[in-house]
Amino acid sequence: MFIVKPSFLSMSGLALILLLTGCQSVSKTTDKVGSWLGVKPSVPEVNAKGMVDLSQTTLNQLEQFNTNMPKNQWVYMKNKTQDVYILQNKSDDQSILSFRFNCQLSTQKPTFYLYNAKGEQILSAYDDKLGQIQFLLDNKNYLNPFNLYSSQKLETFKKELVTAKTIKIYHAGHLYRFENQHAELLNKPVSCQE
């Protein structure tokens, strides 16, 4: 991610901040004036296709969206103003998985990030210090498809992922489980740089 993390905001929420415009002081003032007048700013909603535009979102709206983000499905968050696109999946235990397969910039390589319920990044691709990571699609083990030495494993994984019902990630004695609803969003272009 590109900005410094405020102490009150989780890392997964931080990913969403990337989708904000640079006019935070204006939006905060607008929120204050609106609250004096009894007008509540609406929180962006995910449409039926699993997509949401966060281009005109205030920090307060973004925090509310992050708290209430739909679970057990992929959500494609876009900020057309800043040309930032993020794909995330929130589980029942509040863990968030972010797959970044189709990078907007061809110089970037596909990656993933896994955040715990507190929003702390606990796993990412290509980090040898983390030990063994196993990805399971409908209980079929693909080991770690994000292998620096074999892009073929990743291509096979991506192909199988489109039809899988569940994604499980096993690491250090903990199993993370995600439903794979709106899997068609996995083909969307995303911002791959953290």
Short names for language-model regions:
Residues 19-22:
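C-terminal motif of bacterial Sec signal peptides marking the signal peptidase cleavage site
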